[in-house]
Structures are given as structure tokens and as C-alpha cells.
From Swiss-Prot:
Tissues where this protein is expressed: Expressed in roots and stems. Expressed in the shoot apex, leaf primordia and young leaves.
Name of protein: Cyclin-U2-2
Subunit structure: Interacts with CDKA-1.
PANTHER family documented for this protein: CYCLIN-U2-2, PTHR15615
Species of provenance: Arabidopsis thaliana
């Protein structure tokens, strides 16, 4: 009941979050994170199907492989984005700009496909860069690295490589920003809202069950991201 109301997502609520979100008046995670995670999850599923059918290609640029990690983080996109928000308090507009950067990056590097091996590194890198572009005050790279579960040196390299691969084209004007906001709104309008709400409910149920059955003594066996205490 109460949970259902709090998880209901609509284009109007999303737009309200994007343009008038206030940390002082609202401690909840911005809706844009749920919408963006839904989009990325769908992209991952589509790319996985494509990679199964496609022949191995040598056309993919070797430089983008810097985003590949040896171990896939044991954390959903929703949880990872939620973690970044929780510890950095990056505003909703930062995630929209990061979305713009990811889209530009994929267009500039057509051989690159978002996958489970690179998506987490791509997200923390683009969100950090977007935060520097959008917000007046920012955390150091070392802090973003800690939040994202990376070494500072690795995140520094990812940032630099990303900037060069993008040709340092970071400017996002108002019309571009608005168009991406509209795209996120359409994601909610065309049935995405229900899927996001359903996913959030499932995540809450899983989290509740885990809290009941987990032995606190075994928390140190979780993936490195869960071991970082800030």
C-alpha cells in the first residue's frame, strides 16, 4: 500500500525530480536513477543477444577495453546507481548528463557495446565527469573511486581515456538536455514505469529476505563494493 504509492513512477514525477529536486525536502533516491537503470538493463539484454549471434570482430577499438573489468561486480545497475547517489549526492541532472555522455561515447566508438564487464566502470566514470561539468562543488577522484569500488589510479586512467575517446566534447546545451529528459519520460510513458516499479518491488522483497537469512558474520565475504564503508 504505502510502498506501492512511494514506488509509483510517472513522467510528471520524473520531470519534477529532474528540475526541482531538493535534498533538504526529499531524502529519497531520485526517480531518474530507476528510469536510467531500466534503460541500461534493457541495453545490456539486447547487447547480450547481439553478441551471441555476432561473429568475433576485430573492429572494436582496443582503447575502449580499458573499461572491461576482470570480475563482474555483484551489484545490479539499480543498486550501483543508488550507491553512487547515496554517497555523492550527485543531483538528478548529473545522471541525465552522464546518460548523454554514454550515448555520445557509443556513437563515437561504434565498436563498443555496453556489457556486464564494462557498464559499472562506464557509469562511475561518466557520472564523475558529469558531476564536474554540472555541479559547483565536487568530491575528489579518490572519493568517487572509493564509492565505485576502484583504485584511484584506475579511475584517473578511465577518466582520461574517456575524455580523449570523446574528443573532450562534454558540452550539453539546454535543448540536448531537454531532449534526453523527454526520452527518459517516454521510457516511463510507454510501459517502462510499470517495469521499473515491478523491479523495485522485487528488489525490496529480495533485500528483506536477505536481511532475514543472512548471518552478519559472513558480511565480509561480499564483493568488494559491499565491503567499502564510508
Amino acid at each position: 500500500m504505502a510502498v506501492s504509492n512511494s514506488l509509483t513512477i510517472s513522467p510528471r514525477k520524473l520531470r519534477s525530480d529532474l528540475y526541482s529536486y531538493s535534498y533538504q525536502n526529499n531524502s529519497k533516491t531520485p526517480l531518474v536513477i530507476s528510469v536510467l537503470s531500466s534503460l541500461i538493463d534493457r541495453t545490456l539484454t539486447r547487447n547480450e543477444r547481439i553478441s551471441r549471434r555476432a561473429l568475433p570482430s576485430s573492429g572494436a577499438g582496443g582503447k575502449t577495453q580499458i573499461f572491461d573489468c576482470r570480475e563482474i561486480p555483484d551489484m545490479t545497475i539499480q543498486s550501483y546507481l543508488g550507491r553512487i547517489f547515496r554517497y555523492t549526492k550527485a543531483g538528478p541532472s548529473v545522471y541525465v548528463v552522464a546518460y548523454v555522455y554514454i550515448d555520445r561515447f557509443c556513437q563515437t566508438n561504434p565498436g563498443f557495446r555496453i556489457s556486464l564487464t564494462n557498464v559499472h566502470r562506464l557509469l562511475i566514470t561518466t557520472i564523475m565527469i558529469a558531476s564536474k561539468y554540472v555541479e559547483d562543488l565536487n568530491y575528489r577522484n579518490s572519493y568517487f573511486a572509493k564509492v565505485g569500488g576502484l583504485e584511484t589510479e584506475d579511475l584517473n586512467k578511465l577518466e582520461l581515456e574517456f575524455l580523449f575517446l570523446m574528443g573532450f566534447k562534454l558540452h550539453v546545451n539546454v535543448s540536448v538536455f531537454e531532449s534526453y529528459c523527454c526520452h527518459l519520460e517516454r521510457e516511463v510513458s510507454f510501459g517502462g514505469g510499470y517495469q521499473i516499479e515491478k523491479a523495485l518491488r522485487c528488489a525490496e522483497e529480495i533485500k528483506s529476505r536477505q536481511m532475514i537469512i543472512q548471518d552478519p558474520k559472513h558480511h565480509h565475504h561480499h564483493h568488494q563494493l559491499a565491503r567499502i564503508l564510508l
